Structure formats: C-alpha cells, structure tokens
C-alpha cells in the first residue's frame, strides 16, 4: 500500500471542497469545505478525526486563499509531506477527454477550450488547479472529468436532431454528467454481485439534488439522461428536467422573460421546489406529502413517474436489464422512492423486498428485490472522491 496520500479537490464558483485520502484503505484523514469565496465573509471549515473548526478567509477570500489555508492545516497535522498527488474533479472535458489525465499545459488549454460547455464550473476548476500547482509545488495533478465516462455513447444517443452544422461548429450534443459516480458504482455493483461488469446490463440511477440515470452495457455508458447541460432528463431538486424547448419562446412572449431569466428559473426554481412551492429537499417533500400537502405529493409523484419512465427507456439502451442500481443521496436513503419506482417496473420482472429495502439505507449496500425477480435492484453507495483518488494514484505512478 502506498504511504503517500491523495488530495482530492472539487472547486465551484464560490466554493472549494477537499479531502485527503489513503488510496489503499479509502480512509479520509482530513476534509474541508470553503464557502462564500470571493466575498468578504469567506471561510473554510476543516474536519479532522471527527473534530470541526472554522478558519476565516477574509484576508485572502479566493480559491488560492482557500488552498493556502488547506496547506497550513495539513502542516499542522503533519500531513503536508505525505501528499503524493492531487486529483481534481472537472465537470466538462467535452469530446477532448474520454479518460482521466495527468495535467500539463496542453490539458489546461483543453479545459479552457471546454469552458463554453460548463461556463460556471470549468473556470472555477482552473482556479483550483492553478492554486494547487503554485502551493503544492512539484506534485503531479490529475483531472477526472464528469463527462469522460459517457464518451462511449453511440452517435444515435449523443446527437440532437438539429442541423448538424451546430454540432460541427459549436459541439452541440449530449455530454451527460455524474460519470465518475457511474464508473465507481458500475465497478462496485459487479463486485457486490460477484459478476464481471462486462456481463451485466445495468441501469444506474444517481439520485441527489442533481439527478441522472445511465444505461451501462459491457462496462460502458450507452446512454444517459443529462444532455448538453445537467438540465435535461429527470425531475431534480431545482431543475425541471425534460421540457419543451418552445417554453423559451412562449415565456419570452407572454411573460416578458429574458433567456437568462428563463434559464435560471428552469435550473434554480423548478423541479421539486417549483412543483411543491416548499423545498428542493426530497426528505422535506416526502414528509410533507405524507401529511397531505398537495404540492409535495405532486412533486413526489412526478419525480417517481419520470424516473420510472426513464428506467424503461434506459433498459432499451442497455439491451435489457440485469441490474437496476440506486445511488446518490436519495437513491441510497429513500426506501419510499425506491419502493414506488419499482412498483412501476413489474413488467421488467422486478418485485420489491420490503424488509431488504428498509435495511439498504444509511451507507448499507443491498439487493432490494425478491429472489424470484427476473432482474435485481440493488443499492450501492457511491464514492466519487475515492474514484478520483484511484485515478490520481494510478496516473501519478503512486
């Protein structure tokens, strides 16, 4: 087992999430979350050995300041000299990258080239990457793309039915997301079931505030619900998912809304929040629906119905169904949603085992269908940080 540790960074436009992992055991030795970056009240919270403490970043409230504070914290715990490499989550690698890669100047230029595909995320990833390069001098950096797993999708799945010059000129196509999670979960599902992943036709539902679903066959992505951006597909916490594109023209004409306003509404004010008028949090929606709140009940019903429909279509893309896999915060913990979704899927030969479904929560993996089901439904907790750490160690030669 390597004695060197892996630092994993995930930078947002105003946040930085980090973790120091032992790549061998998967143990997290230190984690941090910086928020309100680029604002006067920026801060970072560190967690070590179960203890949390907060550090003010107001003197240097940007991504570099956050990484500097992280370096000081590592020194305080004697961990700085044990870091062997740094892994970075990057949202979009477009069509340029079908796998994780060691960072050099050419890779940085490639990430810059993909900024139009992820205008909020890729610039932030670059800030974190440059900060890591300057503060952790001489250490290898590896980038792991959310999109790379989906580069195996066939043309019929990733192309939009629009004039093809838009694809050729602007890269207008479906890229998908959550790829690092899908890669980890596909491997874990095969291991858990004692099968070779190349022999499993899987439909994997990554359900969190952002939610998507992917068909996996021969260990590869065959289709996925998110598209050019993460707005396409399932009903999500605040995103609408699939919607008639002419909504833009309709609202511009009738509600006097701009493209930017409509885009923000569909991304940040729709989904469970928009339908219920209450919350984007699935736990709150479930609780209020149980109390009889009409908006919450409708939000839950729509979330489940859309998900069940997509599972059917992804079974087509996978060429059949051997395993339906639930992961992500909602997928791993909501026995209610899993049971109701499987209730739609009797035609695929799936029948819920209620006792097993209740047990498979709070980090517990498990098969949740009956022994006589034609396929299995299984809950597999995801671990994107560990997948990034594995890639980083491998590509850095650790």
Segments (PLM) and residue ranges:
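Internal helix-turn-beta structural module
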Residues: 297, 301-321, 331-398
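Short beta-strand-loop/turn "lid" adjacent to the catalytic site in phosphate-handling enzymes
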Residues: 74-121, 140-142, 148-157
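Glycine-rich beta-strand-to-loop/alpha-helix junction loops that act as flexible
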Residues: 11-12, 89-92, 207, 321, ...
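Glycine-rich phosphate-binding loop of actin/hexokinase-like ATP-binding domains
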Residues: 151-253
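Short glycine-rich, Thr/Ser-proximal phosphate-binding strand/loop in the N-terminal lobe
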Residues: 15-60, 227
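Adenine-nucleotide phosphate-binding core of ATP-dependent small-molecule kinases
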Residues: 264, 271-275, 282-317
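Catalytic phosphate/nucleotide-handling subdomain of diverse soluble enzymes
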Residues: 217, 223-255, 264, 328-360, ...
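Extreme N-terminal starter segment of soluble prokaryotic enzymes
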Residues: 2-7
